Amino acid sequence: MLVSNKTFVVIDIQNDITKHYRDIIDNINAAIEWAVTEGMHIVYIKHNNITAGTRTLKPGTKGEELVPEMKVVSDNIFVKTKSNALTSEAFSAFIAANGINEFYVAGADATGCVKSTCFNMTKAGYTVHVLSDCVTSYDLKKVPEMLVYWL
């Protein structure tokens, strides 16, 4: 059992997410390896879209699965239905049960779920580090603006 208070979090790197994840997947995998050697908890967050009429990230579909290119090194996979990962009761319980207070964050969308999660983690008093070479967006032109926001 890990006793680290640090967690590496990968947000929404799923089949239905932007194709731009392919540009950062090697960086994410390298960061996962780094986090494992540092003794961090590794967490994967998946978005499930339960809104009627939507077609992507639907529960039980191939689109909501984590991308096959990503290293999955733990069973810590939590589902959210809103942009902020802290709204996942299971993820919040995991944080509390493990005394986690510091997060290293990767994923998509930089202007959506990553931004919302990092904002709310910071607001809750956690230390948050966004790995700039491990985030992407549907609109790549917005990534530099988001990096300025975080850094």
Set out the residue ranges of the language-model regions.
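A short alpha/beta connector and helix-capping loop motif
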Residues: 21-35, 39-47
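Active-site-adjacent betaalpha module
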Residues: 1-7, 30-38, 55-151
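Flexible, glycine-rich phosphate/dinucleotide-binding loops
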Residues: 17, 51, 137
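Active-site loop/turn elements of alpha/beta-hydrolase fold enzymes
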Residues: 47-49, 133
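Short glycine-enriched, charge-decorated loop/helix-capping segments at active-site entrances
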Residues: 22-25, 53-59
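Short acidic, Gly/Ser-rich segments with clustered Asp/Glu that frequently serve as metal-coordination loops
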Residues: 14-20
